[in-house]
Amino acid sequence: MAERADLRRRPQRTTVKDILRTAVNLEKKTMALYMQFTRAFQAQEELRKFWFGMARHEASHLGALALVEGVIENDPDVGESSKVWFDPSTVVRLRSLLNVYGREAREKISVERAFEMAIDVESSELEDVVVDLLHVVREQMVRDQAVKLLIHDLSDLSYMVEKFTNDEALLARADALVEHRFDALSIARH
């Protein structure tokens, strides 16, 4: 099962059913991290709203995955026959990051550090897996909405890095992530 990924394995095609629960758990942990940031920056209204929006968007990803789960429950053959590309090391890396960052966020963290953590998490390729899983739904509108929301989130992240930090390297990472995701998701849509 994907939960206990072997880091030596290469990206592979795996069934939607096998990866769905893992994706749900990682999205929940990502949402929880952003909620920690919401609390950490509650005194700065614009930052609080931004982090709450990021958490809310992770919740919408969970809703999309629940829709995938509903499709699979109503047509189990789809869950067994539909496959997505999956790299087991993505799960191991992201789970480790989320655990470490969750502990770190319990303490006082800087705005720069929160943005750095978010860029690391958003760079994990999990969102690509979520978009791939949405192919099971067979509604282009649902996939398009997920892609637009992801690009919007990353663009907002880049904007906030620029507005609240003077860290050019961090801004360059955020901008590169937006461009990478835009290119990757635009190709995947066609």
Model segments located where?
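Non-heme di-metal
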Residues: 2-190
